[in-house]
Amino acid sequence: GERGCASCHEDDNPQLGAQVNANLTDGVCGACHGRQKAEALAHQISDVHRDAGMDCMSCHTLEDMHGDGNAYLSMLDEGAIDTKCSDCHTSVASNSYHSMHGETVSCSACHIQSVVTCNNCHFESEVEVHKKIAYGQFKNWKFLLNRNGMVEIGNYQSVTHNGKAVVAFGPYYAHTIAKDAVSCGDCHGNEHVEQWHDQGVIDVVVWDETKGDPNGKNLVAAQGIIPIPPNYFEGGMRFDFVTRTAVGSGQWEFVKTGADIYQLLYGTPLT
């Protein structure tokens, strides 16, 4: 629904009088930003800023929260988010990593440890009982794409409905920062790059019935750093999809391999 002052500031008065709660906690932000909340709580992925006692508002500006007077379609629009790593990190260490990649690879592409992905949302549940139900969340991976001449972190959302499937990719920022999140070999010549070079496809999420899960949760997700290749929409990334056997059921079953629609917004494939 539409968000207003009381969505964050928790005032009992719907007309918002003079008294509002200005002491916001990360829990307020997490009420909407569920993946970021899951990074810290459900999956307990460390973050150097969080570990240092910082919270959301330590980095994000009032303009990020309240807007700057311009209308944006998405927080991914240029100018919509004011916060940058360089606001605090005015200089970087002199080393081979920064000298080699500093102009073409974003800070987050290397320093984010993992993204959290809500995989395979069962849209029948959203339509019929107004409840979001995903197959589950995957972690220990991150996707790479191009954006404005830089290699950036990406993520995706996948949805099924009545036998149809959609995958939408876009840039993403996870709050899972670490100093030594990757090594050279994590990107260069990793198993996903090699599979794409050899076969023209990357196995991202694959149905494996040999898992024998009693609830049919037999999807296996890739691990590590996964490039979004130029043929991502032509079978270059394998996604298997499942659906619930019925709305309200806890049982899942295989539906198909491959999405009916692929989208990549605010970025281009990694080349």
Feature-to-residue mapping (PLM):
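C-type cytochrome heme-c attachment and multiheme electron-transfer modules
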Residues: 1-14, 21-271
